[in-house]
């Protein structure tokens, strides 16, 4: 079935590249109007992505204190609301806890978790997310099993697992589903910056013995936003090739 999202409006954070861009493409292919949000420093790449899908760009830092209200105002004024919210934006700043500077801890928690809570508080509180809407958060295998040197990252991704479990019940009355997707090793710019040996180990520590592609994750996210996923909420679903980490 094509155009299962015809008439729907979607927000994808971290939408300039990687999983975010792949998700935006999949949602647009199903008929949704997709608004991609990313930091102003990536505006050129962001514009390229939205031009490809016929969407709209929203250059913004989600950690800015006024970002949630700006997002809410944009969707209320431009579209009367939003149907799909994909919280994809995230970063890593890896250090063992003993060597982690406070600003690195704070940065990861702010982007990966705090900003999501702040945005949803406004979008849900002001009923900008329409009845029957979909919220999908990007968690990680690192939030299920944890990885050495990723205490900050793992804490945020584990936090999202608890967040969707709690929010799903709160939003059920309006027919809004809230789920998370937990990718394993995915071939993105972020993983490409890992040291070679760590990157190769990440690729091979699953039953498929290969890294996943952004499109693999995007396909699941797309499904969770469609009418066929109306019965799925409060869940965290892995896309990891049966990762040996957290098995």
Question: Where are these predicted regions, by residue range?
Answer:
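Substrate-binding pocket helix/loop in short-chain dehydrogenase/reductase
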Residues: 96-97, 104-106, 202
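Alpha-helical segment proximal to the catalytic Tyr-Lys
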Residues: 125, 169-170, 230
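Short C-terminal tail/terminal secondary-structure segment
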Residues: 145-148, 222, 233-247
């Amino acid at each position: 079935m094509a155009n299962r999202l015809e008439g729907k409006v979607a927000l994808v954070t971290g939408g300039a590249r990687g999983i975010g861009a792949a998700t935006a493409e999949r949602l647009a292919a199903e008929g949704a109007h997709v608004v991609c949000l990313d930091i102003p420093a990536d505006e050129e790449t962001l514009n390229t992505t939205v031009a490809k899908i016929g969407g709209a760009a929203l250059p913004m830092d989600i950690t800015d204190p006024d970002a949630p209200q700006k997002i809410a105002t944009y969707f209320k004024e431009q579209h009367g609301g939003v149907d799909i919210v994909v919280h994809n934006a995230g970063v890593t700043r890896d250090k063992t806890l003993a060597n982690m500077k406070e600003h690195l801890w704070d940065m990861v928690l702010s982007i990966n978790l705090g900003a999501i809570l702040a945005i949803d508080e406004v979008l849900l509180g002001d009923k900008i997310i329409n009845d029957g809407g979909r919220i999908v958060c990007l968690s990680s295998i690192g939030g299920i099993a944890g990885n050495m040197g990723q205490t900050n990252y793992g804490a945020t991704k584990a936090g999202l697992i608890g967040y969707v479990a709690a929010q799903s019940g709160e939003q059920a009355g309006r027919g809004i589903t809230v789920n998370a997707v937990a990718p394993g090793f995915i071939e993105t710019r972020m993983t490409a910056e890992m040291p070679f040996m760590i990157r190769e180990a990440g690729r091979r520590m699953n039953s498929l013995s290969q890294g996943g592609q952004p499109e693999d994750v995007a396909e699941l996210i797309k499904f969770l936003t469609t009418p066929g996923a109306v019965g799925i909420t409060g869940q965290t679903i892995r896309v990891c090739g049966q990762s040996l980490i957290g098995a």
